[in-house]
Design a protein with these regions (language model features):
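Conserved core of the sugar-phosphate nucleotidyltransferase
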Residues: 7, 173-248
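N-terminal nucleotide-binding beta1-loop-alpha1 segment
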Residues: 16, 51-86
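Conserved beta-loop-beta/alpha segment of the NTase-like Rossmann-fold superfamily
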Residues: 125-198
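Active-site activation/catalytic loop segments of kinase-like enzymes and analogous catalytic loops
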Residues: 206, 503-532, 545-563
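ATP/Mg2+ or Mg2+-diphosphate-binding catalytic cores
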Residues: 284, 290, 294-298, 553-584
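An alpha-helical support segment within catalytic cores of ATP-dependent transferases
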Residues: 300-315, 418-474, 485-486, 576-580
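ATP-binding pocket architecture of kinase catalytic cores
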Residues: 320-427, 442-449
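Active-site acidic catalytic loop and adjacent metal/ATP-binding pocket
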Residues: 320-342, 457-506, 518
Length: 584
């Protein structure tokens, strides 16, 4: 059966089922006017000449093209969709009165697709209602926060047949799904401007022959896809081969197709009209489409911002994500032309950070000129708003001029006449976090007891050596320093601050710089100036090991809460071990 014959026959079948909300592809009108194909179908007995309806034989002829099932990908955190994605997955937001994923499932079921599998990850429990409501199946992607959607498709490999591949956050103006599909395809539309989507080139039969990013205009991929079994099998073979390499771990599945087009079975573009398929990558895009989100987002985060600035929701705009920090997640927003940054506290941080203490420290830091960016912080929930500084640089650990700038700030900070009744105690705090870890996994810490013993010994050696406590920052690694164009230095993020040992601030800068012993001694000498002596130097070198150990245990705890710490965890372990062994 030719593509034209299939399209005509399938259209008549859809009319026979009394579907009225079909989303037509661009080529449909032209194909339906193909009288030669129509006559061939009549001649084969697939269309009744008198009634113009599909016959039983025609329906039987469609059977080899039946769609078996659908897979809906709903595992990702949609980090570009801040701030709403911090509260719940994008697929669960209502658009025009219906949740995105509910609408898509209902459209699939209306088209006769009853076998639907949803791949879950981020906030998966919020989707559980779908099982009872729609009788869908679930697959769980535990790697949703470290791998992209190829992992979701690979985990669903046993469901792959003649299958729709869907994203939970697509919005179709009408129903694009059918009980029968002719060939493997990806939906797409023509755009007249540059976007961040994948552009495609096609041949005369609309087979995709090239895929590329960054064109000025053309056909882009957008919406659902359909894979026939041979295409799915080859895709999964390629995905399997990449699992030991990880080249595509951070990429969308389209990239694997792009790089292997010649090896894959034919893959076609099904073009739709403009403005019938929508993807809301950013919250501002959703606001343009559904006006309820201009004034009534029903978002706790937006409400928080409103309460601070006493403004209408519509004035809060231009949301942009910030690369996730080690402790929290943040995003930028704008009010009346001024950019601010909102910090959303990370999971598990309530067990290791006292937010009322942090707020007091932020007030002190602003009062004394160390952090003029602070606007507001909520001590109950831990969210914070600051002025966004768009242009600055971080210090260069190997640049002596930068070192002098940093040390000048630290000397001034450690000299302010401020005393508070809280502060970081890296040894004791590490023991507390170890207890939290061991509650989750009693055996997780066994191999680190020798290092723990050395750090404990160093701590005891520094307790009575005369170094006085003072007001400290507690988290002096490079990303918390801003050197502005006028060389003014700002120190941000005061979560770990308080009345503590100054070795914490000096030691952590050394740890993050991964200084060798001679570089660390030079840094300590420059900090202490005329107060330098061997005993003082030992104290700060010891605290380099102690604070590295603290952050190592902290990283283990954060990973136990689901965070991804990467190589930092190992670097902290190595620096703690290296300095402890050197000093003992």
């Amino acid at each position: 059966m030719t593509k034209a014959e299939f399209t005509i026959l399938n259209h008549l079948y859809e009319r026979g089922t009394e579907r009225t909300n079909e989303l037509p592809e661009v080529a449909l009108t032209q194909i339906l006017s193909d009288s030669l194909s129509y006559e061939r179908l009549v001649g084969k007995g697939y269309i009744d000449r008198h009634s113009g309806k599909i016959t039983a034989a025609g329906i039987q002829a469609l059977e080899p093209y039946r769609v078996d099932n659908a897979i809906i990908m709903a595992a990702g955190a949609s980090t570009r969709f801040v701030p709403l994605s911090l509260e719940k997955p994008k697929g669960l937001y209502e658009v025009k009165g219906k949740r995105l994923i509910d609408r898509q499932i209902e459209q699939l079921q209306e088209a006769g697709i009853k076998d639907i599998t949803v791949v879950l990850g981020y906030k998966k429990e919020m989707f559980f209602y779908l099982k009872e409501k729609y009788q869908v199946k679930f697959i769980f992607n535990a790697a949703y926060n470290i791998k992209n959607n190829i992992e979701s498709l690979y985990l669903a490999r046993n469901e792959m047949k003649n299958t729709y591949i869907c994203s939970c956050d697509n919005y179709f103006m009408d129903n694009p799904f059918h009980q029968y599909e002719y060939q493997s395809f990806y939906a797409g539309v023509t755009v007249r401007d540059r976007t961040n989507e994948m552009y495609v080139e096609t041949d005369e039969q609309m087979r995709i022959v090239e895929m590329k990013k960054g064109k000025a205009e053309g056909l882009i991929l957008m919406g659902h896809a359909f894979w026939q079994k041979p295409f799915a099998s080859k895709f999964l073979e390629l995905a399997e081969a990449d699992r030991s390499i990880g080249m595509y771990d951070s990429l969308f599945w389209e990239w694997l197709v792009k790089d292997h087009l010649p090896e894959l079975p034919p893959f076609y573009l099904k073009e739709y009209a403009a403005n019938v398929i929508f993807e809301f990558d950013y919250f501002d895009e959703l606001r343009k489409f559904d006006e309820q989100y201009i004034h009534h987002t029903q978002s706790k985060i937006i409400s928080n911002i409103q309460s601070v600035f006493h403004c209408e929701e519509a004035k809060i705009c231009h949301f942009r994500k910030v690369e996730e920090g080690m402790t929290n997640t943040s995003f930028i927003f704008q009010i009346d032309g001024v950019d601010y940054i909102y910090r959303h506290p990370g999971d598990g941080t309530e067990n290791i950070i006292n937010r009322s203490h942090e707020k007091r420290s932020l007030e002190i830091a602003k009062e004394w000129g160390f952090d003029p960016t602070y606007v507001y912080m909520d001590i109950n929930e831990g969210w914070k708003i600051s002025i966004y500084i768009p242009s600055f640089r971080e210090p260069d650990y190997q640049n002596f001029d930068d070192t002098e700038k940093i040390l000048a700030v630290l000397r001034r900070l450690h000299a302010i006449p401020v005393s508070v009744d809280y502060g970081m105690r890296p040894w004791e705090d590490a023991l507390t976090m170890e207890e939290l870890l061991v509650k989750k996994d009693p055996s997780c810490f066994h191999t680190f007891y020798p290092l723990k013993e050395k750090i404990g010994k160093l701590y005891q050696m520094t307790k009575a050596d005369g170094v006085k406590k003072c007001f400290c920052h507690g988290d002096t690694y490079r990303p918390n320093w801003m050197i502005k164009a006028d060389e003014d230095v700002i120190l941000i993020d005061w979560e770990y601050s308080g009345y503590s040992d100054p070795g914490i601030d000096i030691g952590y800068y050394i740890v993050d710089a991964m200084y060798e012993f001679d570089q660390a001694e030079q840094f300590i000498r420059a900090y202490l100036k005329e107060d330098y002596n061997e005993q003082r130097c030992f104290h700060y070198m010891a605290y380099t090991a102690i604070i590295a150990y603290y952050w190592f245990v902290w990283a283990m705890y954060r990973e136990s809460c689901g965070a991804i710490m990467g190589e930092s965890l190992y670097q902290w372990y190595e620096m703690a071990k290296k300095y402890a062994d050197h000093l003992l």
